[in-house]
């Protein structure tokens, strides 16, 4: 184990002992906010220090076995004990490295998932609908809650644009690598010659902003227009101006919501999506310089980057960032995404570990 990593773990062990002392005091609950902070920190440090204690025990076991090597009658036993201790140390060190990785502050947040049809006309809109179904089925498997925020249906089915809110533990940490261009290759239902068409959609995954004060929006910077909601094909679906369009003048970001019959609810939803888009824009601007110096294959979230191809005739899905091809497209489109998402998370962790190694 690197000296820098061991030093960090020693510091965390000392801090955990301090927390144990603080939490055992009689007046610890006098300040509930402080008490919650201490218990949260204790919960985060406990598993790390526990793993480190196991690593140190394995190191001590190896040292004890080394002393037995001089005794010929104990040599076989000692060599086996050394091998076993080193295997445990290697495994525990790998787990500790992952535990010490810097945490994305957005990982525990709910998300807004936005899917837009791109090149390919009606077929692209149909594929946007298929992608939405894929994510909704995955959310169902995770027992997450889903709320439709805004939808713009296309004439033949599917969506020109759709935004849903997904709420649940780990929503952003599991889906944040879905941002980017998704390409589909298949024979459209409207194709009479059996030719394979290529079309594309873009996906954006945005962490939900906190209710209070995280994104400051000056009401003077907003232009709010109301209009009659319309369905596919442009037909009006109610006779009141319940649909709301919010424009954030400084950034040019526009959000429309028309799914509810209540203008107030549509406005509230539009402002929530707007806050998430502004937060997302700020996040990407903040990380632009960092991305330029160290190109991250997984975590860039660049909407213009083609990240994945879905080839229906061959029944395969290829993620171009990690060169992963899975020949079980039907299951993937039905929301069975654990293998794919797990591979992306693992690759991202490997990138972070490599960058930490470069820094040492």
Curated annotation (Swiss-Prot):
Residues that bear N5-methylglutamine: 235
Entry GO terms, CC: cytoplasm
Record keywords, A-Z: Cytoplasm, Methylation, Protein biosynthesis
Main location group: cytoplasm
Record's subcellular location: Cytoplasm
Zinc is among the record's keywords: no
PANTHER family: LD18447P
Annotated family: Belongs to the prokaryotic/mitochondrial release factor family.
Protein name: Peptide chain release factor 1
